[in-house]
Structure formats: C-alpha cells, structure tokens
Amino acid sequence: MLPCFQLLRIGGGRGGDLYTFHPPAGAGCTYRLGHRADLCDVALRPQQEPGLISGIHAELHAEPRGDDWRVSLEDHSLQGTLVNNVRLPRGHRLELSDGDLLTFGPEGPPGTSPSEFYFMFQQVRVKPQDFAAITIPRSRGETRAGAGFRPMLPSQGAPQRPLSTLSPAPKATLILNSIGSLSKLRPQPLTFSPSWGGPRSLPVPAPPGEVGNAPSAPPPRNRRKSVHRVLAELDDDSQPSESPPPVLMEPRKKLRVDKAPLTPTGNRRGRPRKYPVSAPMAPPAVGGGEPCAAPCCCLPQEETVAWVQCDGCDVWFHVACVGCSIQAAREADFRCPGCRAGIQT
C-alpha cells in the first residue's frame, strides 16, 4: 500500500475529477496547479471565466513524515485560493488536513455561482495498480508537451495490470454510484391476516389489478339460525315482514309444521310462546308419541307433518286428520268438532 493524497473535485467539469499524488520515496516534491498545462502538473481550465485562474495558481508541497506525507498549500495567484472558505494570503504556506475544502479562484459575491474548481483534500493508502492517475511531479523548467499529469507504474515485481483495463471512472465516483443504487430497492409489503385459533401462513400479495377479482370469504354459518329457517313456519314471530297484514295481526293462529325425524318437546320452537308449557297442552310427538286429538287419527306418514291448534280448547290436531288446509286455518279461526258441537248446542 502506498501513502498518497488526493484532490477530489466537487461540482461540474469534464473528467479529471480525482487526482491522486504519490511523491517519490525519501524526498519532498512540489506539484503546481494552474491553467498553463505546459508548466503545471494539474491543469485547471475554466469553462465560464478563463481569467479567474492564473497560469500557476497554487502549489502543493509534500514532505515525508514517517509513513505518511505532510502536505502544504501555497497561493501564487492574483484571484485567490481559499481553504475551508478562508482566503489564503498570497505566498503564504498552510498545512492541509484530511477533509479540507480547497477553492481555486475568487470567492463570488452572495447569489453568484461558486468557483468551478472546488476540491476536497484526502489522505489515503492505495494500491498503485488500482489507479491510473498516480503521478510524479514535473521537474522545474520542463516544457515538453504532454508531460504533466501522467501515471506512475508500480515497482518491479509488484502485481500489475494494463492501464487499459482500469475503469475510466474514478473510484470515488463508483462508490457514489453504488450508494445511489440503494434508492432503486423496492421494499416488499408486509402482508398478514388476523389469526383465529392458530397461526396461519402469510398470504401471497396479489397484483393490484387482481385485488378486485379476489373472491370474498363466505359468511360464517350460524347453525341455530339455520335450524330456525328450516322451522320458519313454527314460530309466529318468524313470519317475514312482507306477509299480509291480516296474518301478522291475528294473535291466535296456531300452526306448526314438523318433520318426521324430529321429536317435539316442551320447549319446541314452533309452539306459540304466549301459552304456558304444561303436559296437556304440549304438542304430541310425531311417530310413536301421543297421537293427535282427532277421534280417528290417520297418523300421517309424510316427512313433513302440519299441526293446527283449536282456538276453543287449545288442543292440537293433525291438519290431515281434521280435513282442513293450512291456508284455511291461517285465514279463519279453527274449531275442533267438539267445540263446534258445543257452540251449536
């Protein structure tokens, strides 16, 4: 690893954004910066105002200090050189620290554009074969064209690779590009559903266009509600609101429809709740229980058996045994034969 120092350019400009310097071992040296490429190691060619950069604008003096270098900046310009936004007196030499900001050219008034040449000073240790901009200083008085900022190859025996294979972009630029690529990452949305009764696997998020087409979960089934719907005609309160008003206003319509496998009990849903539960008034069982009160019960064998209660004695009869229909029992009062005989006498 070679102890080097760098000038990293900040802002606009074409190429030459990173300059890496490695002075010869064991001796100090001087690097010159300015717009005279034939006299300077680093050519500063302004694009906006050429007169703001002197031919030899400033010098970098490097002196060995242990395993590192002591670097100082000296101003030789008429327009000025700034270190951390403080103007350096002409001819004065100032030692630089890692991270200092160097500005070559005058500091513009507030509201104007800053200087084109704005650098950060860095002290680093690098491998020579990783940079094509490691240079040696130009000897004073040398005016050969193209002999300014040129690469220095590694020492004999050190691993090296051809300069043509090196990346043309500066290393600092590559690092900034890799950091900027973090903005391209797209976080995956965390989707979960509430757990009822145990853990569940997370559902796979569907594309936005398919969300509206996803089938909704079926509503939970209520077993008690289902049974009530099967025996909807057994309860006066279960009549729908669309039923005819006479049926809703009649308090003494006592009809029930039983299924053959079901056995009526004292708390049977079809029995009107306005009558007390007692043994004589309990509806007879279907299939094997107490028959209806008709003198000649025919014991209907249908799966669904309809019952009707007498409005006089509150006794239950099979609709088929008394010879009437459910519709007729709903529309008018039902009287059993015994009650009708009592009314006639």
Curated annotation (Swiss-Prot):
CDD domains per the UniProt record, alphabetical: FHA_TCF19, PHD_TCF19
UniProt key word Repressor: no
Query: Transmembrane helix: is it a keyword of this entry?
Result: no
Q: Which GO biological-process labels does this protein carry? A: regulation of gene expression
**Family matches, as SUPFAM superfamilies:** FYVE/PHD zinc finger, SMAD/FHA domain
Q: Which InterPro entries match?
A: FHA_dom (IPR000253), SMAD_FHA_dom_sf (IPR008984), TCF19 (IPR042803), TCF19_PHD (IPR039095), Zinc_finger_PHD-type_CS (IPR019786), Znf_FYVE_PHD (IPR011011), Znf_PHD (IPR001965), Znf_PHD-finger (IPR019787)
Which cellular component terms (GO) are annotated to the entry?
nucleus
Q: Which Pfam families match?
A: FHA, PHD
Matching SMART domains: FHA, PHD
Task: List positions binding Zn(2+) 1.
Answer: C296, C298, H318, C321
* Keywords, alphabetical: Metal-binding, Nucleus, Transcription, Transcription regulation, Zinc, Zinc-finger
**Entry GO MF terms:** zinc ion binding
Q: What is this protein called?
A: Transcription factor 19
Give the gene that encodes this protein: TCF19
